[in-house]
Swiss-Prot record:
InterPro entries for this protein: Eisosome1
Provenance organism: Candida glabrata (strain ATCC 2001 / BCRC 20586 / JCM 3761 / NBRC 0622 / NRRL Y-65 / CBS 138) (Yeast)
PANTHER family found in the cross-reference section: EISOSOME PROTEIN 1
Any one Pfam family match given in the protein's UniProt record, by short name: Eisosome1
GO biological process: eisosome assembly
Basic and acidic residues composition-biased segments: 701-725, 779-801, 873-885
Subcellular locations according to the entry: Cytoplasmic granule; Cell membrane
Protein name from the UniProt record: Eisosome protein 1
Length: 885
């Protein structure tokens, strides 16, 4: 067993030389294993570290030596050594064939039977015997020195060999006679030196801390005992690795040039490199690699630990732990190693079984020769190894001689054949040159004749083509003249037709333009009639909205003034309360004086009267404060009502605009379809009745003149003034009149339509602008180009009767105009609170709008049933939702 690894399986190379150059190889991959599953000895591990330059620096404190589990250390080392081919190759034990075993047997050495005796003297005898046996094996291995390359080497270099006749002849002529005596002496000398180096390696102290002193050796011997000595002896005796590759490299080294570096030199350089690395580690100062403040921090830590610990506390803790451990041991006595009798019996039985197995394994090796490295062979196997090494050498000599004779015969045969083929080739070349000369003359004459014939044929063909093309050109010219004449006639005819067509088109276009102008003017007048009621309602609603905004601003101003007055009254009340407290104190003092003196009765009565006056003033201020707070609440309610009315007006304005757009879209749709009437189903879905029913229900009424309206409003105002308002109403009216601002304090949420100085005609025109987009003339010209029958379709559209649409829209807009006329009533002097509520309900009832459908949302349509009460109640109005697309 070597210091690093053992190899169970071997690589066996079986070479058989056939026809002088062929070789076969049978190779087994080695497997690393550990025989007895025991760790290496300390000495073996120390020698391995010295050999490979392993040094465990004290700087790396946390890094241990080897692996954590000592049982797996040997297998780990063997696997690492087997994977690292550059370092293991020189020490690996390979297969020793039968020739080596046979040669070792013929030397005359006696086999040594190893016994389980581990005494020191026995160890020396076994080592000497092992050296003799391995020397004999080395002699047997070196017999065939001329055949240095084994079957595996020949297979590797097979691609580099050439087997030409010249190389075989030169190899045969330059080969020297083999001197077996020199080969055997050199092999024996090398083998002995190598065995000595492996069995007794030189100890060099690369690192003093890792060298084994005499005391350490004594400790090791005392601790290890006989078993340790036997293990060391076995490791030293089994550390011999001889193989064919190593022996081949040893013999080849003698034939290399002096300056050429072989595999052994490379291994020596690796050893030097390891030595240099170990020396560098030795010279390394561990303190230089530590941080600068390492010593200071360590001293600080020790000082901290010294202050934090106490010998008394440690002793008490130690005693407590000992007591607890003792109690635990007493409780678990069955688990202790020496107290468990069954465990001890099983351990003794297993130890006896292991010892018996070891004796059986040693008895199997009895009568065998220890070749080294843990290999034991019988004498017959050694004889077979020697025979296998010598026989191939003699067979190779005879095979080379026979191959040389066959090569000489083949050379003579090939030379004769070559000379005969050369003479035939020369005759063939002379005949070829003569034939080439004759062929060139014949070909030149033939090419000249063919060239002249081709030239004559081409000239004749060219003349015929010229004549034919002249005739074609003359005919084409005649056709061109005729085509030009036809083109002129066609142009004159087309110009005449185009002129007539242009004149006709201009006349039709002029007529169509006149008709379109008339139609557009009629449509504009009709649209103005439709939009007029809605425009009037919109103007009235905007005016009413502005009045509501002004009224709201006035209320806001009055609220601000009242709040300031309330703050002033609160301050006065606080002053009066302070005076009351002062008078109370004075009253107490005066009472004491009255009891003591009894003379200032009149002065005391005056003081009491002053207290009563102050209480009266306080009560008065509180009454004024309550009045103004009530007024403030009333104004806030009025402001909220006005704001809601303003929002209602905005909604009504938007509703009217959407109603206008809906009516216009329905009218345009009916005109586009060419219908005589509007779709009655959609009208019914919108108004809840057909157009005829709607006209019958809403008969046209005459509008009152503006002067009559003004008179009616003045009469109502005078009647309201004659009525006796209540005190609250009078106060509200006075406050409203006093706080009416000249300008609005805040802008409305939605800005109303600004009053513009434009004329009524321009304003109506702006309303119609959204129905006519783009220049009218361009639009009419585009329609003329795209459709030739516009005039006929327009005539059909003009024939459609539309009075029902006009009357419907006018009658529908009438109630809204009447409602907006009553709007000025809300800016008169306010009535009492109860009357204000009833008037507001009446105004809501009068100003309510007919629910209609916006073009893109749902709206409720009022039922035919009317409400009997004047107050506005949403619960009494039944409606349904319709959606028209």
């Amino acid at each position: 067993m070597s210091l690093i690894s053992t190899v169970d399986d071997h690589t066996q190379d079986t070479a058989s030389v056939a026809s002088g150059s062929s070789a076969t190889k049978k190779k087994y991959n080695p497997k690393v294993y550990h025989d007895d599953n025991q760790p290496l000895s300390k000495e073996a591990m120390y020698r391995a570290k010295l050999k490979y330059g392993v040094y465990n620096s004290p700087i790396s404190g946390g890094v241990g030596v080897g692996v954590t589990d000592y049982k797996a250390a040997t297998n780990k080392a063997a696997n690492v050594a087997n994977d690292n081919q550059t370092t293991v190759e020189a020490y690996r034990r390979l297969y020793v064939d039968q020739g080596a075993a046979s040669a070792a047997l013929k030397v005359g050495t006696e086999p040594v039977r190893e016994k389980p005796d581990v005494h020191a003297e026995k160890f020396k005898q076994n080592r000497a015997l092992n050296l003799n046996y391995t020397s004999a094996a080395a002699k047997a291995l070196s017999v065939g020195t001329e055949k240095l390359f084994t079957a595996s080497e020949e297979a590797r270099h097979a691609g580099q060999k050439t087997y030409s006749i010249v190389s075989q002849v030169s190899a045969a002529s330059t080969s020297r006679a083999m001197d077996m005596s020199k080969v055997l002496k050199g092999a024996e000398r090398k083998a002995e030196s190598r065995l000595k180096e492996r069995s007794e390696p030189e100890r060099k102290e690369y690192v003093k801390s890792y060298s084994m002193t005499a005391g350490a050796a004594a400790d090791y011997g005392a601790a290890g005992g006989a078993a340790g000595a036997a293990g060391a002896a076995g490791a030293a005796s089994r550390s011999i690795d001889l193989n064919s590759d190593v022996m081949a490299r040893v013999a080849k080294r003698s034939e290399l040039p002096p300056k050429q570096e072989g595999p052994t030199e490379k291994e020596r350089n690796a050893a030097k490199f390891a030595l240099g690395a170990a020396t560098a580690v030795k010279d390394l100062d561990p303190k230089s690699m530590l941080p600068e403040d390492f010593a200071a921090r360590e001293q600080q830590r020790q000082e901290f630990v010294r202050h934090m610990t106490s010998q008394k506390v440690l002793s008490m803790a130690r005693e407590k732990v000992d007591r607890e451990m003792a109690s635990i041991d007493k409780q678990q006595a069955e688990r202790r190693l020496y107290d468990n009798d069954s465990y001890n019996r099983a351990a003794v039985a297993i130890a006896q079984q292991n010892y018996q197995n070891k004796l059986n394994a040693q008895s199997e090796k009895a009568g065998k020769i220890n070749i080294g490295g843990g290999l034991f062979l019988t004498p017959q196997e050694v004889d077979n190894i020697a025979h296998g090494l010598i026989s191939p050498v003699l067979g190779e000599v005879s095979e080379r001689a026979e191959a040389q004779r066959a090569a000489d015969t083949e050379i003579a045969t090939r030379i004769a054949t070559y000379e005969k083929d050369l003479s035939n080739w020369k005759n063939l070349q002379r005949t070829k040159q003569t034939n080439d000369k004759n062929v060139l003359e014949v070909n030149s004459k033939r090419i000249a004749l063919e060239k002249q014939e081709a030239k004559d044929a081409a000239q004749k063909k060219y003349d015929e083509m010229i004549k034919k093309m002249d005739e074609t050109v003359a005919e084409k010219k005649k056709q061109l003249e005729a085509a030009k004449q036809r083109l002129e006639d066609l142009q004159e005819e087309m110009n005449m037709k185009l002129g007539m067509q242009d004149q006709k088109v201009e006349e039709e276009l002029q007529k169509w333009d006149e008709n379109r102008e008339k139609d557009i003017e009629a449509a504009r007048l009709e649209q103005e009639e439709l939009v007029k009621p809605f425009q009037d309602e919109l103007d009235e609603a905007e005016k009413q909205h502005e009045e509501f905004l002004k009224e709201r601003d006035g209320i806001d101003t009055e609220i601000t003034g009242l709040q300031e007055a309330i703050e002033g009254h609160k301050k006065k009340i606080e002053i009066y309360e302070g005076d009351i407290r002062a008078h109370d104190n004075m009253h107490v003092e005066e009472g004491g004086k009255l009891e003591n003196l009894g003379q200032n009765k009149e002065t005391l009565a005056n003081t009491l009267n002053n207290d009563i006056i102050i209480l009266a003033n306080k009560t008065k201020e509180q009454a004024e404060l309550s009045t103004k707070q009530a007024r403030l609440k009333q104004l806030e309610v009025d402001a909220m009502v006005n704001e809601r009315k303003s929002e209602l007006n905005q909604t009504e304005i938007q509703l009217k605009k959407e109603k206008l757009q809906l009516l216009e879209s329905m009218r345009n749709k009916a005109q586009a379809r060419g219908d005589e009437k509007i779709d009655e189903e959609k009208v019914k879905g919108l108004f809840g009745m057909t157009s005829e029913e709607y006209l019958a229900k809403h008969a046209p009424k005459k509008e009152e003149p503006a002067e009559e309206k003004l008179e009616t409003v003045a009469e109502e105002a005078s009647a309201m003034k004659k009525e006796k308002p209540t005190a609250a109403a009078a106060t509200t009216a006075a406050a409203a009149a006093a706080t009416t601002p000249k300008k609005p304090a805040s802008a409305p949420r939605a800005a109303p339509a600004a009053a513009s100085p434009k004329s009524e005609k321009k304003r109506k025109g702006s309303v119609f602008d959204k129905f006519f987009l783009g220049p009218r003339k361009a639009h009419m010209i585009e329609e003329t180009r795209t459709n030739q029958k516009v005039a006929e379709e327009k005539a059909k559209m003009d024939s459609v009767s539309k009075p029902h649409l006009v009357s419907t829209t006018n009658e529908h807009a009438k109630p809204h105009a009447a409602a907006t006329e009553e709007a000025p009533k809300k800016v008169d002097a306010p009535k009492p609170a109860t009357e204000v509520k009833s008037s507001e309900a009446a105004e809501d009832e009068e100003n309510k709008l007919e629910h209609t459908f916006s073009g893109f949302s749902q709206g409720s349509v009022a039922d035919d049933k009317g409400t009997t009460s004047g107050a506005h109640s949403e619960t009494k109005k039944d409606g349904y939702f319709k959606e028209v697309f």
